[in-house]
């Protein structure tokens, strides 16, 4: 959980440094300031988003604390699946894939790759475009344009939760100032008190500015970046499918088509040419494929 680790680092360094200067943590405990900042931030989030955006943001929050499912093994499964589908269509004709795409969960080919079956976005993307290709009513350029449009739509939808969190993060420092000003107003209204008490009230008011900035840049705004990164991973998978299928439509053999798809992947997850070649060879031999997946 890198997010939780990052939060611990933020809290440890900020409050640890404060203690090193001789400060008291008790002075930073100001529930009223926190209520003002958090409440105003939540309120601005509700005001600035429609119901669809709010629901999408809440739905995206659990994804922040899950490990990425788009690993090297996932990409290898994707390329192997596409290879098997393309090889079958080349050997037996495109119409031989009808049963596979009509009910992929009962397909022998798809069943070999449970990680792909578990990803409804990728499964629908693959099946839908194979169905369009089989129909024969669209040429390569039309299919490519439609794929680009769907990928762009996915990215736009994924950007909504990220933007919502980013805007909340941007607003928190301002709400911290609001809380601080209200605290200063309270302190000035108590100007007849002794200097020691007045100083404590002003110090408490300044905690609002501190909390607003800390919550914004240490906790909320980084979450928007994580959501964008997760969206980019899904888009990369879709681009890999797009390039692979279009290469096959343009006449390239399945081994070359999956090589096109491999080249679109990020270097951190991209299998080497030899790894992909060995994986494709294993695909050609069902027994060897089963052994490889069990391992």
Swiss-Prot record:
Q: Which residues cross the membrane?
A: 2-21, 34-51, 171-191, 201-222
Q: Where in the cell is it found?
A: Cell inner membrane
One Pfam family per UniProt: MotA_ExbB
In its UniProt record, a GO molecular function of this protein is: proton channel activity
Supply the alphabetized keyword list: Cell inner membrane, Cell membrane, Chemotaxis, Flagellar rotation, Hydrogen ion transport, Ion transport, Membrane, Transmembrane, Transmembrane helix, Transport
User: Periplasmic side of the membrane: what ranges?
Assistant: 22-33, 192-200
InterPro entries the record matches? Flag_MotA_CS, Flagellar_motor_stator_MotA, MotA-like, MotA_ExbB_proton_chnl, MotA_N
Q: Which GO terms describe its cellular component?
A: bacterial-type flagellum; bacterial-type flagellum stator complex; plasma membrane
Topology check: give the Cytoplasmic ranges: 52-170, 223-295
List the membrane topology term(s): Multi-pass membrane protein
Reported impact of residue 96 to L: Suppresses pdeH disruption motility mutant, swimming velocity is between disruption and wild-type. In the wt background velocity is reduced
**Reported effect of changing residue 93 to R?**
Suppresses pdeH disruption motility mutant, swimming velocity is between disruption and wild-type
The reported result of mutating residue 93 to E is:
Suppresses pdeH disruption motility mutant, swimming velocity is wild-type
Mainly localized where? membrane
The biological process GO terms on file are: bacterial-type flagellum-dependent cell motility; bacterial-type flagellum-dependent swarming motility; chemotaxis; proton transmembrane transport
Q: What does this protein do?
A: MotA and MotB comprise the stator element of the flagellar motor complex. Required for rotation of the flagellar motor. Probable transmembrane proton channel. Overexpression of MotA, with or without MotB, restores motility in a pdeH disruption, (a c-di-GMP phosphodiesterase) suggesting there is an interaction (direct or indirect) between the c-di-GMP-binding flagellar brake protein YcgR and the flagellar stator.
Q: How does it assemble?
A: Each stator complex is composed of 4 MotA and 2 MotB subunits; in E.coli 11 to 12 stator complexes can be involved in flagellar rotation. 2 A subunits and 1 B subunit are thought to form a single ion channel, so that each stator complex contains two channels. Interacts with FliG. Interacts with flagellar brake protein YcgR in the flagellar basal bodies. In another study YcgR was not seen to interact with MotA, but instead with FliM and FliG, also in the flagellar basal body.
Protein's UniProt name: Motility protein A
- Its source organism is Escherichia coli (strain K12)
